[in-house]
Each structure stands twice: as structure tokens, then as C-alpha cells.
Amino acid sequence: MSKQSVVKTKKRVKRVITDGVAHICASFNNTIVTITDRQGNSLFWCTSGASGFRGSRKCTPFAAQVAAEKAGRAVLDYGMKSLEVRINGPGPGRESAVRSLSNVGYKITNIIDVTPIPHNGCRPPKKRRV
């Protein structure tokens, strides 16, 4: 007779997090939306590329809206009610991502622009000639 191995699995307890932080990184090529708790522990992330957009369609405001909506709906399971939004970068999906998070049903407590601005640091790249 062979021994039967018994595998014990622990049930994952869903944490209840009432408020969190939505980090929106909007570059010229893509938009990354990460939703964390107050301590910075990542709960869910989504990008324009992961939402099914490829190439030049990744950098559109609609792609950023879809990515933020997808991330917002995934975190509703935690019982989150309000979000603080931190926007980073100069991309075209900045405002549409914030608007879609509020349309999902979150109360936006405050919006902070955390884009790093140099005090005349590095020399910028040369101008494109097309």
C-alpha cells in the first residue's frame, strides 16, 4: 500500500483596506497604474499594454482610461472607498486615468503631481529631425 500525501493549504484572508494610493506613471509611450495601501504595499497594477493595446495605441488617453478602470475594479474586493492619486510623468493619459478611477466609484481625496522637475540638471536630448 502506498502512502497518501496530505497537503494542507492555508486560506488566504482578504484584508480590508478602506483607503489607498493610486500611482499613475504616464510616459509618452505607456501608462502604468499601481494601486497600493497607505504603507506602499502593492495591491494591483495594470498597464496600457497589459490591457490589450499595442504600439502607438498604448500612449492614448483611452488606453490609460481602460488600464485605470481595470486596476480600480480589481481592488474593489478589498473594500476600498477612497484613493489618493499621485501622478508622475508628462504623458497623455494623466487626466483620463484619474477621471476613470472616480467613475469606478472611488472618492478621490487629493491629487498630487510627483513628476520630478530638475533645477537645471542634465542636458536634454537633441531635437528630433524627421
UniProtKB/Swiss-Prot annotation:
Pfam family name, one: Ribosomal_S11
Family per record: Belongs to the universal ribosomal protein uS11 family.
Subunit structure: Part of the 30S ribosomal subunit. Interacts with proteins S7 and S18. Binds to IF-3.
Function: Located on the platform of the 30S subunit, it bridges several disparate RNA helices of the 16S rRNA. Forms part of the Shine-Dalgarno cleft in the 70S ribosome.
Organism: Xylella fastidiosa (strain Temecula1 / ATCC 700964)
Protein name per UniProt: Small ribosomal subunit protein uS11
Taxonomy of the source species: Bacteria, Pseudomonadati, Pseudomonadota, Gammaproteobacteria, Lysobacterales
One function term, GO molecular function aspect: rRNA binding
A single BP term in Gene Ontology: translation
The entry's keywords: Ribonucleoprotein, Ribosomal protein, RNA-binding, rRNA-binding
Gene Ontology cellular component list: ribonucleoprotein complex; ribosome
